[in-house]
């Protein structure tokens, strides 16, 4: 075979290969152009992404988290020894004072009891209109001295909903015992359930020995109680209107009395009888219900060792804040209630006048990125945060609305991916500013790993990029 023939054959082969390459490049360019969304993650990929975010951005996935920016130290006059204030929409801690001091929760313990009960209702194991048997351990006459009571007695007919009302409004220790024995048969077994709730939420200082809050051996901190309350409100928001915001409760009524009993006045000066027949109306122990704008929960607590405690929440214009104050001062209940009113008002009014919620949902979502020189044609970059509400400080404008209108959101991310992509690679960010002040910078990370393509695909993709 002569030299010219070899050259012609070689040229033909090269031309054919070049034509094939051009055709491949054209087809790939067309495919990439029309590729507008990434393939859904499979279960393993979803698990890997979740694991990565939890490991590398763990603070963003805690129940409570610090502000993403600094503010001047607030000049608040909080009387309680320990306190915390959070935005329930995102768990942001707006204010704290000795929030990690371990203190008995007293009757705030009952919130954990209510949580366990609500979980049983949600699971279909109990219903609100269900009649609950009252063991002797739950009768008012068998409660420890100075217990708060809803006045349960032998033979009474009481529904689950009435017990929850008695627990939340009257802070009835007898109601706490009745619920514990109904659900688990013994106080010890019910307390195990409560402690498991605390453990599941990562509350390391929260521990219970009984369900009413009477014992000083029950322990928690303001921070951990706030974290629990946030979860409680997220999972059972109806409990606020159904129980915690109700201003008064009368028990027992005619329909609650034991067979043969009739409504009649009684003298309790010598102790409580087994059969209680006198209706007693009690007001909600929370002194800010119906007093401070927006307040609709949650729970007071007092024993000598704890001082005057209060878990408080209020909602105005769609924004909800929650405070926990513990070891409040007071030589008597009147002084203790005055302290609760003072601290609750101080914290809530400061929160509503100093912050507002800004919804970032229209920005905090996955963004599609085309991939060149990779095994797949694209992937998503996702925000490394779970919350879509930002607590915004009031720093500019004559009104909070004007303040919010000055927020600017900047999206900054790569145009295209190239070659190997690793799960979690930072590919950009979302920057939220107010009046030139950065409030939050959210990393945008790759939601999956992609292998690098072979040399021919890389060459084709390089040409496609050059011609864009």
Task: Give residue ranges: language-model regions.
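Active-site-adjacent loops and short helices of periplasmic peptidoglycan-processing enzymes
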Residues: 3, 29-235
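Intrinsic disorder/low-complexity segments
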Residues: 12, 81, 199, 259, ...
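General helical structural elements
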Residues: 7-12, 32, 37, 303
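N-terminal Sec-pathway targeting helices
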Residues: 1-18
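Domain-terminus/edge residues, biased toward the C-terminal soluble/receptor-binding domains
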Residues: 29, 203-204, 216-220, 224-468
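Hydrophobic alpha-helical membrane-insertion segments, chiefly the h-region
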Residues: 17-28
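Hydrophobic alpha-helical segments and their boundary regions
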Residues: 12-15, 80, 102, 144, ...
């Amino acid at each position: 075979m002569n030299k010219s023939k070899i050259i012609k054959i070689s040229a033909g082969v090269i031309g054919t290969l070049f034509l094939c390459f051009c055709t491949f490049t054209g087809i790939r360019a067309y495919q990439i152009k029309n590729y507008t969304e990434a393939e859904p993650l499979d279960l393993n990929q979803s698990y890997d992404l979740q694991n990565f975010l939890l490991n590398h951005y763990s603070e963003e996935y805690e129940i409570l988290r610090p502000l993403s920016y600094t503010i001047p130290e607030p000049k608040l006059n909080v009387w309680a020894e320990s306190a915390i204030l959070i935005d329930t929409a995102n768990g942001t801690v707006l204010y704290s004072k000795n929030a990690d001091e371990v203190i008995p929760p007293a009757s705030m313990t009952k919130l954990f009891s209510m949580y366990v009960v609500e979980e049983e209702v949600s699971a279909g194991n109990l219903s609100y209109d269900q009649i609950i048997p009252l063991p002797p351990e739950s009768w008012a006459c068998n409660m420890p001295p100075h217990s708060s009571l809803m006045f349960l007695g032998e033979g009474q007919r009481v529904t689950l909903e009435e017990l929850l009302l008695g627990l939340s409004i009257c802070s009835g220790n007898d109601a706490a015992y009745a619920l514990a024995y109904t659900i688990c048969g013994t106080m010890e077994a019910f307390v195990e359930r409560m402690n498991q709730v605390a453990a599941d939420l990562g509350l390391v200082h929260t521990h219970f020995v009984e369900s009413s809050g009477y014992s000083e051996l029950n322990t928690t901190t303001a921070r951990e109680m706030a974290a629990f309350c946030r979860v409680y409100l997220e999972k059972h928001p109806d409990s606020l209107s159904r129980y915690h915001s109700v201003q008064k409760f009368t028990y027992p009524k005619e329909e609650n009395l034991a067979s043969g009993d009739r409504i009649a006045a009684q003298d309790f000066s010598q102790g409580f009888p087994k059969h209680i027949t006198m209706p007693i109306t009690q007001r909600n122990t929370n002194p800010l219900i119906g007093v401070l704008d927006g307040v609709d929960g949650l729970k007071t607590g007092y024993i000598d060792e704890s001082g005057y405690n209060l878990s408080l929440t209020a909602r105005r214009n769609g924004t909800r804040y929650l405070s926990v104050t513990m070891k409040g001062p007071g030589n008597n209940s009147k002084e203790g209630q005055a302290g609760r009113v003072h601290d609750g008002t101080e914290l809530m009014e400061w929160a509503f006048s100093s912050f507002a919620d800004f919804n970032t949902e229209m920005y905090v979502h996955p963004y599609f990125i085309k991939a060149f020189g990779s095994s797949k044609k694209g992937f998503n970059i996702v925000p490394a945060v779970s919350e879509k509400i930002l607590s915004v400080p009031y720093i500019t404008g004559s009104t909070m609305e004007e303040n919010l209108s000055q927020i600017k959101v900047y999206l900054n991310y790569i145009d295209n991916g190239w070659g190997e992509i690793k799960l979690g690679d930072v590919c950009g960010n979302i920057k939220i500013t107010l009046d030139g002040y950065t409030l939050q910078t959210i990393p945008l990370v790759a939601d999956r790993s992609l292998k690098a393509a072979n040399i021919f695909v890389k060459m084709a993709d390089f040409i496609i990029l050059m011609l864009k």
